[in-house]
A protein has these predicted regions:
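Short His/Asp/Glu-rich catalytic/ion-coordination signatures at enzyme active sites or charged loops
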Residues: 3-20, 66-73, 122-148, 345-359, ...
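Sequence context surrounding c-type heme c attachment/ligation sites in exported
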Residues: 46-147, 350-354, 537, 556, ...
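Extended extracellular/luminal ectodomain segments enriched in beta-structured repeat modules
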Residues: 200, 210-216, 313-321, 419-425, ...
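Short beta-strand-plus-loop segments that form exposed binding edges in beta-rich domains
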Residues: 221-223, 323-330, 430-432, 528-535
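Disordered, acidic Ser/Thr/Pro-rich linker "stalks" and the adjacent N-terminal cap
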Residues: 149-152, 162-202, 206, 225-227, ...
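Primarily short, surface-exposed interaction patches in extracytoplasmic proteins
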Residues: 2-48, 152-160, 316, 368-370, ...
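Short coil-to-beta strand junction motifs in C2/discoidin
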Residues: 229-243, 331-337, 438-456, 536-542
Length: 966
């Protein structure tokens, strides 16, 4: 099945497909009939009303590798995955080297080149989504968290911050720059500094006020068209670093009596990492306050509030002189500062009442502003929609849903009929959808964040003429790789830059584009959206709308159903609708950010475990399959339809030409291969060799069966008895053939040296996983826990670190350390060391028959591997606890390791070995503590004896008989 917990190839990142492995275990333990086992794995999603387990079962063919290297074509490696699926299907059910027909007609077997691709066509028409597997308790937990979130929403107004301070704007009397930058005093009492920004500067603002009892100061950093990106700073990107803020005060009627104002505390609306507000008043010029917190929050107005240690109050009024030092970073200067002064609020009302009043007042201000900028959007339904690969389908809400394959460079082309009115703005909404990875809005599924998209360029033609854009805005923008990801970058004619919403998958976002001149109404609109970067990242669901509003529009995070409410006059707005607007305000206003963050966390559905599955594509969007000359991805020829290998068995006319039909054909009663191949593989598991030795090749290049009549009888009996694997296993192990002694006599070597005629019982080396599990069982450490993600048992350090990225191996603790080998985490590029040493496959391709080698490293592994040392120490502790004689305990250990009692000679040799080891430990020739390992044994057992038992266990675990069956 080529199971692995990672994707393979260079990056070999982790994947979640262990639920399929657990399904296989449950199915085998329940003795699921093999014909049903086949159908559910190949086509469980095509069964009527498939269960979750039947969907999980389709993960069989998701065990293919996935290449996430930056320079590859994902469609090419999807083709390679398909060739792997065809080859695996051929090996597993047909026992044929079908893969040899990928490049040409099979040289030996009756498999046509065309038939290979017809077989591929059955498997090729499937999408490859992740399946969420929520726990039964997840929904109840989610509902409880939603109820908690609603309780917080209901109390938002009660938490609204109130101004303990009454703010006033003093008169700006003077503003100057130490470096001589030009300055203008503006009507709002701010100062605008312009001209070429010096590397460092000291700005001085002098303000006067008649207010008394001043206990704090607020520095506003305002935006202005004269500043780079409107500011608030004078450096190219608009940031600033305020190294130090100092304040002096003097009576208005005695300005020469100024004194320094001691500053107690500083707090800002935003703080750049490493540049907190407190550093603006720490008397250190090499530190400071800055506001670049990422995204589009930089180029906004910000403020810093500084509290005084003592009130400043002069009866005649006060003259304040504020010094703003900018010494920390070149040109990082505030461009348009304004000073406000605060005094304690005299409001006598209860705090709760004041909070509600403040919330309502803020809501009214927001509502007024929102109404002034409200936009009536008209959604456009495309009259035509095409792309390089995905199918674009119009939805009832006028959105467009993309489905199917995507490439690293994809262009959507859509045609719309414009409304009669001139268009002043075009809106592109990126919408979530449950069919998309992580619910979208993008289709990215590898390399980048799942659900991501990257719009490199947006172009619009109106009436055949290109539209020139004036500006663009977005509700949210973030780049998963690189710097900015803004809507403006989607209209800069550079496809390497663009708009993305990484980090907020599963949410709605929008971008608004303003044309230089209004677009003529009634014209035909041709929109092209270019998606692409080093991974496939097309948009999965979107909607295009336009408006004729004078002045255009700006993108904002406002649900579509609320925008029309802003058009309703206040008197006509029903209380319930007004409450919806108030609720939205409370959930988005910056004053309640902390509580909003908690609400968002509570509303988020708990992350469910996932697994990889297949999902048949819709009938209106089948994936075509082509014959590829010489098996080359880049040489597709004519299209082929699903079909089987004619020489095997005809395809019944009543079966559908899809994966379900293929599965039914494979397990049909007249199919000559599936039952034979399956029973042969089971025979191999017990005898070491199949009745057909070449388990993977029943063709002309394979070996003929040693007992053809037996193979035929077993196959027919297997089908007649419900395809029961457990019955077949019981049948084999209870047979006189299997129960023979495996002892080799001289006549065996002469007439049947390889035991092809079954003249004796099987004697074969155990597989790597069984060797490890046998050691765990013998030591008493084996955990019977079933299911769950892969675990990380101990192995030598550095095994995984040599693979790409230096992946760590977080060694499991507790019971997970000693789980069955079946549950060991499998990394394709760095296989578990002990398994690799004992010839286990890496999961890169289907393997019906393992090679068996004998190397010195295998003996060294059994002797020195950290796992076998732990096992021998655990077994030694257990033997030391027992109360029998030395001989009795040796018999116990021998029976546990080799499942038979020792002979007298073996017992004597082992007892002599135990005594000699104990003597060496007593003589300090060996380190008893190191050999015995950690742990205490109750009673009076000396450390030397416990170490001797560990040494004896280690010797038993290194015997050839332990790793050999028979």
């Amino acid at each position: 099945a080529r199971y692995a917990d990672t994707n393979g190839y260079e990056k070999d990142r982790n994947r979640s497909i262990w639920p399929w492995r657990d399904w296989v275990i449950r199915a085998l333990n329940a003795d699921m009939p093999f014909d049903r086992f086949t159908v559910e794995q190949l086509a469980g999603d095509l069964l009527p009303n498939p269960t979750q387990d039947q969907l999980i079962a389709t993960g069989f063919h998701r065990n293919t590798m996935l290449n996430e290297e930056g320079g590859i074509d994902p469609l090419e490696f999807r083709f390679h995955a398909m060739t792997d699926r065809v080859a695996t299907t051929g090996t597993t059910w047909l026992g044929l080297t079908v893969g040899c027909a990928q490049c040409h007609t099979h040289k030996y077997d009756p498999i046509q080149h065309r038939e290979y691709y017809q077989l591929m066509a059955f498997l090729n028409n499937a999408d490859e989504p992740d399946l969420d597997l929520p726990e039964p308790t997840d929904e109840a937990r989610h509902q409880a968290r939603l109820a908690e979130a609603e309780a917080l929403v209901a109390g938002l107004a009660d938490q609204f911050p109130i101004e303990e301070t009454v703010w006033s704007t003093p008169t700006l009397a003077e503003a100057r720059s130490q470096r001589g930058s030009p300055v203008r005093l503006l009507d709002d009492q701010s100062a605008l500094f312009t001209g070429a920004a010096p590397d460092t500067d000291t700005l001085t603002l002098v303000v006067t006020t008649k207010e008394t009892h001043i206990d704090r100061l607020r520095l506003d950093t305002l935006l202005d068209e004269a500043l780079p990106k409107k500011g608030p700073g004078r450096v190219a990107h608009g940031n600033f670093v305020l190294s130090e803020l100092r304040v002096t005060a003097a009576p208005l009627d005695a300005p020469d009596q100024k004194r320094k104002v001691a500053l107690a505390h500083a707090q800002a609306d935003v703080e750049q990492s490493g540049f907190p507000a407190a550093q603006a008043i720490d008397d250190q010029l090499q530190t400071g306050w800055a506001v670049d917190v990422g995204g589009d929050r930089l180029n906004r107005e910000h403020h810093l509030v500084v509290r005084f240690q003592n009130e400043v109050s002069f009866t005649a009024g006060t003259r304040f002189e504020i010094t703003l030092e900018h010494q920390q970073a070149a040109q990082h200067l505030i461009g348009r500062p304004r000073i406000r002064l605060g005094r304690p609020s005299p409001d006598p009302r209860p705090v709760a009442e004041r909070r509600k009043a403040a919330a309502e007042a803020a809501f009214q201000r927001w509502l007024q502003q929102a109404r002034e900028t409200a936009v009536r959007w008209t959604p456009l339904r495309p009259t035509a929609a095409t792309s390089n690969l995905p199918l674009l389908t119009s939805q009832p809400d006028d959105s467009v849903l993309a489905s199917g394959d995507i490439s690293k460079s994809d262009t959507y082309r859509l045609t719309f009929k414009a409304p009669p009115e001139p268009i002043t703005a075009v809106r592109l909404e990126a919408l979530p959808d449950p069919s998309l990875p992580r619910h979208g809005p993008g289709m990215a599924y590898y390399e980048g964040p799942k659900g991501d998209f990257f719009l490199g360029e947006l172009n619009l033609n109106a009436g055949g003429q290109p539209v020139r854009w004036k500006s663009a805005s977005h509700s949210y923008g973030k780049n998963a790789f690189g710097a900015e990801a803004t809507a403006t970058l989607a209209i800069d004619q550079d496809p390497q830059t663009g708009w993305s919403t990484a980090g907020r998958e599963g949410q709605r976002h929008e971008a608004v584009f303003i044309p230089e001149t209004p677009i003529a109404g009634g014209s035909e609109l041709d929109l092209s959206l270019l998606f692409g970067r080093h991974y496939a990242c097309s948009l999965g669901r979107f909607r295009v709308s336009v408006t004729s509003r004078s002045g255009g529009a700006t993108a904002r995070d406002l649900p579509n159903d609320l925008e029309p409410l802003l058009m309703v006059p206040d008197a006509a707005l029903a209380s319930g609708l007004r409450d919806r607007l108030r609720r939205h305000f409370l959930l988005t206003t910056p004053e309640l950010a902390e509580t909003q963050k908690r609400i968002a966390q509570l509303r988020q559905r708990p992350a469910a475990k996932t697994t990889l599955v297949l999902r048949e594509r819709p009938t209106d969007n089948p994936r075509p399959t082509f014959l590829h000359r010489r098996g080359e991805f880049l040489q597709p020829a004519e299209r082929v339809e699903p079909g089987v290998i004619a020489a095997i068995a005809p395809f019944p006319a009543d079966l559908p030409k899809n994966r379900l039909g293929l599965a039914r054909w494979l397990v049909s009663s007249n199919h000559p291969l599936t039952a034979r191949v399956t029973v042969n593989r089971q025979w191999q598991a017990f005898f070491g060799k199949g009745l057909v030795k070449t388990t993977e090749d029943f063709g002309y290049q394979g070996e003929s069966p040693s007992h053809p009549e037996l193979l035929d009888w077993l196959a027919v009996d297997f089908m007649r008895n419900g395809w029961s694997l457990k019955r077949l296993h019981r049948q084999i192990v209870l047979s006189a053939t299997y129960r023979q002694s495996s002892r080799i006599r001289p006549e065996h070597l002469e007439r049947d040296s390889e035991n092809r005629w079954l003249s004796r019982g099987p004697s074969v080396r155990l597989e790597a996983e069984i060797i490890r599990d046998s050691a765990l069982r013998a030591s008493g450490l084996l955990s019977d826990t079933m299911g769950g993600p892969g675990v990380y048992p101990p192995q030598p350090s550095g095994v995984t670190e040599v693979a790409y990225g230096g992946a760590a191996w977080p060694t499991s603790l507790g019971q997970d350390r000693y789980r069955r080998s079946l549950y060991t985490f499998t990394k394709r590029t760095a296989p578990f060391a002990m398994f690799n040493t004992f010839d286990a496959p890496t999961g890169e391709s289907c393997l019906a028959r393992r090679d068996t080698s004998n190397t010195p490293l295998q003996a060294l592994t059994l002797l020195n591997d950290i796992f076998f040392i732990e096992v021998s120490q655990a077994m030694g502790r257990d033997l030391a606890r027992q109360t029998g004689t030395v001989s009795e305990r040796i018999r116990t250990a021998f029976q546990r390791c080799l499942t038979r009692p020792p002979t007298a000679v073996e017992l004597q040799a082992l007892e002599s070995f135990w005594n000699s080891q104990r003597a060496r430990f007593r003589a300090k020739e060996l380190d008893a503590a190191a050999v015995a390992g950690p742990g205490e044994v109750s009673g009076e057992t000396p450390l030397e004896e416990r170490a001797a038992w560990s040494a004896l266990s280690r010797a038993l675990l290194n015997l050839d008989e332990l790793i050999t069956k028979g």
